Amino acid sequence: MNSSFSLVFHSLLYATPATLVVALITWRIGVRFHKHDVVDTMWGLAFIAAAYASALATQGHGDSTRRLLLLLFVTIWGLRLSTYLALRNHGLPQDPRYTAMLSPAQGSEDWYALRIIYLLQTVSLLFIGLPINFGLVSQGKIGLVGGVGIILFFVGFSFESIGDWQMRRFKSHPENKGKVMDQGLWRYTRHPNYFGDFTLWWGLFLISAEHGSGIWALPAPIFMSWLLIKKTGKPMLENQLQQTRPGYRDYILKTSGFFPWPPKR
């Protein structure tokens, strides 16, 4: 166990600067275009950078199949998410949620953004990614628990991807401007993308925690779940949508807030 913890710590020594480089580059882009919601695009790419830096730091350790799966899963999730968000946000004004976050800034808004948005998200990201660090050095073969984790990852990835695709298609029709999306997966949960993120990260945790000391990374998916359900995900978005989307309050009354469930009649 002590060996696992020392390897995880060693991997973080590589993952931290790799993630900071991505954050600083993204911050410079945000400064250049006066648009700090670009940090959303950083999220997936920074996880990829952290995962590969950690893998580099722990070469020769851990089960090779688990290492390969974790890197593959983080890569396809991160690339899809960052690509989708970059395309979605291109040409749009800054997300009002980030404008509100930056409103207390005294002096340079850009330096305030670096501290409050980019560096804070970097710390959160490194913490949320701890299951990956533990999983990369786990020696045991993938068994039943890991298999359940793989299934959860694909269920979550499918929910997130399909939900985003359905929303993008809905918004592509001019006649839907200002309307509430309540079709497809959005009929069963107000946030299929957040539910997907929640599910796939619990899946990654199970893959990583099946053997050895990976169970110590349990606070990471709990923290991620709290962010999505109680803090920066669902609550902030719904507060904004209730003010900007007529009919969203009715949508809330009939549609499950997070976990998929048939709508109320």
Placement of each model-derived feature along the sequence:
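Short, strongly hydrophobic alpha-helical membrane anchors
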Residues: 1-9
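Hydrophobic transmembrane alpha-helices
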Residues: 9-23, 46-81, 85, 120, ...
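C-terminal ends of transmembrane helices
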Residues: 24-35, 83-88
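Broad structural signal for hydrophobic residues in well-ordered alpha-helices, predominantly aliphatic
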Residues: 28-29, 101, 241, 251
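A broad structural signal for alpha-helix termini and local helix breaks/kinks
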Residues: 32-33, 105, 245, 255
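Helix-loop junctions on the outward
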Residues: 32-38, 58-63
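Juxtamembrane helix-capping/reentrant segments at transmembrane boundaries
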Residues: 33-49, 93-116, 179-186
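Hydrophobic alpha-helical segments and helix pairs
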Residues: 81-134
